[in-house]
Amino acid sequence: YQVNLTRREYRSITGPLEPVVRALLETGQPRHGADLPLPGGRRIVSVSPESFLVRRGDQLLTRPIKGTRPSDVDPDELLNSAKDAAELHMIVDLLRNDLGRVAVPGEVRVREPRAIERHATVLQTVAEVEATLRPGIGFEDIMAATFPCGSVTGAPKIMAMHQIDQLEASPRGPYCGAIGWLSHEDFE
């Protein structure tokens, strides 16, 4: 059982945000980064290394991350962590179940059970789970089966979400959500 609790922190920035956003994106060098202006001068800036869900035709791929160390640590420290291995395995099982709700029976596969991924400032362990979609499954069906991603809630997902609601001081809002793009057939 795992609940991924978070703590909201607020910071005020005086002056233009562009240099701060640029520095954040350049330092983190995220695989998935975004700078979304909002009404009222607010913005969402995202520097996430995690790929929640990718669809290409009838294929779905999710790449959950569990286990993080500073980038200057020996990768074996992370690979030898039983705690991090157990957390990733638990989330992989949860995501296999989520994808199984929209997949062709027997067509959910763990492509990579656990690998080290190096980022600018951290090392992380990542898995890859893929599935072949059943015919007629659309975006809404996929999101209903998978969102929010188990790697940001914990497992079992519904119980973890209930605990998050009880224990966190405010709703997460865009934090731990998903930013991406959609086309007629594909999304990321």
Model-derived segments and their meaning:
Residues 1-188:
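Extended alpha-helical targeting/anchoring segments
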